[in-house]
């Protein structure tokens, strides 16, 4: 029990590393919380005009999700705890991104971190979700719409592959939270005022 709690806590701390802010500071860019959507995520960093910073943010936010799950799985095999703790570690990393302890619990929407978690939990399903996101994003140029469609699809695919595994429950919770974090985007999509990929930043 003690080690299970430690693994989940470590995953949360990893998730709390807000790379949108960290990368922007390192590259001497404006804080992503001060322009565009105000969201500390790769899509908003892209609005700064610095594609390298956006790509680094995207990759690092995804990697922390992957690392959290892989560490949990590595320890699970040696300490004898089950898939439930691995699933909780993935969820904890996602929650860390949404509510980071290092950044006053003001985090991003979790798309890249969720993608990393999904890939680590099941790479085939993770790739399918990434493909769905990419397809919608390319066709519509709405990152938020792509995230919402993928959030609806992910629990279905994981249920098909894993049945009643705790992994499915963790993915369902992540999807619900991701949709909730995009509630303002949903309103903008319905009103036709949502920003498209590649749009220039405005002060938040």
Regions found by a protein language model. Name each.
Residues 1-7, 67-88, 119-125, 159-170:
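Helix-coil boundary and interhelical linker segments in multi-pass alpha-helical membrane proteins
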Residues 21-53, 185-204:
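Cytosolic, membrane-interface loops and tails of multi-pass inner-membrane proteins
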Residues 46-50, 72-76, 92, 96, ...:
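Interfacial segments of multi-pass membrane proteins
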Residues 47-73, 89:
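Multi-pass membrane catalytic core of lipid/isoprenoid biosynthesis enzymes
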Residues 30-42, 102-115, 142-150:
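Short, non-helical or kinked segments that cap or interrupt transmembrane helices
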Residues 2-28:
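N-terminal signal-anchor transmembrane alpha helix
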Residues 5-10, 54-55, 86-91, 115, ...:
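Hydrophobic alpha-helical transmembrane segments
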Residues 20-23, 43, 94-106, 133-140, ...:
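C-terminal ends of transmembrane helices
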